Each structure stands twice: as structure tokens, then as C-alpha cells.
Amino acid sequence: CGLRVVRLGLRQEASTGEFPVQMLCGVSESGQQLAQRLVDRFARHWPVLVPRHWAGLAPDVLAAVAVRFPASARLDADDRRDLMNFSEGCRGFELTLPVLRQLEQCAGVVAWLADAPDFPLWCRVVTQGWSWNAVRVAGLCSGQKEGEARLRKLVGELLKNGPEL
């Protein structure tokens, strides 16, 4: 239908427990430009807002919103090296987290990740900022060591078979 998510409420509605969503489809040229500006802005704000306001949202819901965002980041040679080193176990998770967050904003990455079996783990730890203990309690991994190993494997697969970075 052409509607695009331009805003997601910061608080759940009291009556339904749902987050309000604002969607827009410009019908005139100026309306289309406005819609694009709002989508671009929402995409830029997304990485900051998700862990603060939507940390409990289901990974498939987050993916459904984020997959429609325009690419807002590009990786440089240093970033790609960090990802390779992380996937090979030579760089720590916390040191790589800024690049992992940036990776989500590259063209086609969220769509590729959303199809991966470990996307819920990625989403909870990388996108939503859950602690390793929280993902363990949620049953997504047995702890940090196993969780990091699975994320390393996922990044390695993305580098080999994912979208061009």
C-alpha cells in the first residue's frame, strides 16, 4: 500500500499494551519528499532509540521495521577488518559492538540477518543491548562464551555470503 513507518511510540498504550505507529505515504511530490525525510531521520535515530525504548520488542517486529530503512552507513576497510577479526575470534565482542551496530545500517544487512537462525540472539544482544545474563535467562544461549561464538559464526557467514559491504 506504500505506507512507510516514520515513527514508533516511545511508550506502550495503556489500554492495549501496543506501541503506537505512525506511517506515511506521500501522494504529492512534496509529500513524498517529506515521507523520505522522516524515514531517513527515523533510520538515523533507530540505533539510539531501540535499546532505550524498545528493548523488549520482538526481534521479528524490529526486523519488519528496520528492513525497510534506507542504508545509512558504509563500512570502511578498518571496520571490515574488525568484523573479520571478530569472526575469527581475534577481537572481543565489546570492542566490535560499535561496528556491529553500524553493520546493521548497511544496505541489505538486516534482511539477511532476519533470515538467520541466530537473528533473535543478534537482535537481543547487538540491537537491543541486552546483557549476556538476560539472553541466557531468556534461553537464547547458555552464556556469553556460547553467545559470542554464535555471533562470531554469524558474522563470518555474513561476510562470506551476505550483501556487499
Per-segment meaning from a language model:
Residues 2-165:
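Terminal substrate-recognition subdomain of acyl/acetyltransferases
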